[in-house]
Amino acid sequence: MTRLMTRLSVFSIVAASVVWASLAAAETHEIKLIPKNVHWGYYSRSVAPILRIQSGDTVSVETMLAGGRERLRLAGVSDSEIPESLKEVDRVVTDRGPGAHPLTGPIYVEGAEPGDTLEVRIVGFEYLHPYGVSGFIPNSGALPNDFPYDHFMLIRFNPAAGTASFRPGVTLPLAPFFGSMGVALNVAGRIPSGPPGAHTGNIDNKHLVAGSTLYIPVHVPGALLSMGDGHAGQGDGEVSLTAIETSLRGTIEVRVRKAERLRWPRAETPTHYITMGLHPDLDEAARMATREMIDFLVSEKGIPRDEAFILISVAVDLHVTQLVDGTKGVHAMLPKSLFQ
């Protein structure tokens, strides 16, 4: 069956025909970085939505870097270089935790119901300040016993060139993305912003740059989408605990895919389909990502299950998304070029 194609080829989820929620009269919205738009350190169904949108709407969302002003202080950022909006959020939003990530949201998406999938198209990013920070704290990251102290670096950007200066002689490419994008779960209390999970959240997947699409399972009416943890660049693994942490204005387009149930988040880029595994045990995370890819190949490409397993072995790359969030991540990347 020929599937509906959009600006990006759609990473379809079920073999049934695609059913879109109404896309009539799509609008563009803007969410500023101000205290009332931020919940710090958690996802929760109890947080009142700050915006209601229709399927197909576009939203520009301002976010604050993980750790807030204190993270900037540790890297030696002068107070005069910190935007006033960040200072105000840091001063006013005192109800925090258990995580360290200021999140902007939630956004209520009309028509989204449990059992649906939220399609979040990543349109683009801008920096709220021309620098980021990266480093580690004691007893953290992939080498918790090797560095019993904290150390943070200020990394300045050249946005026009798309680069960042790490140190003399070392230049990094800029590739901004939201480390955390997620929805509320239908459970009481706060879901910590650190570990990713069924709500998606802090997946720290470096491929979710402009031009990519993230597919998030919906668990509560309206989905209650929030985002934050801006990264200007990251390596697979994120081994020190941090990427290039920065504050981003991200533009997204949100659509509801009715009755297309996912167990775990998926994604796609212009060149790859991506499935994910999230588990405290890295081996189990790899198995989850592999099984998710098998399910995709069976349902969407019509490949028998046993042959799908073999195809993954010969053509799909498994990457360690991150090792440091408690719940580890592995993502499988399937080249679209395999399919004629």
Set out the residue ranges of the language-model regions.
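N-terminal, Lys/Arg-enriched amphipathic/low-complexity engagement segments
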Residues: 32-96
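Short, Lys/Arg- and Gly-enriched loop/turn segments at beta-strand edges
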Residues: 66-78, 125-135, 222-232, 322-324
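Short, structured beta-strand/loop micro-motifs enriched in basic residues and often containing a Trp
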Residues: 34-44, 96-104, 191-199
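Intrinsically disordered, low-complexity linker/loop segments enriched in Gly/Pro
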Residues: 101-102, 108, 123-209
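Conserved mixed alpha/beta catalytic, RNA-binding, or beta-rich assembly cores of soluble enzyme
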Residues: 176-282
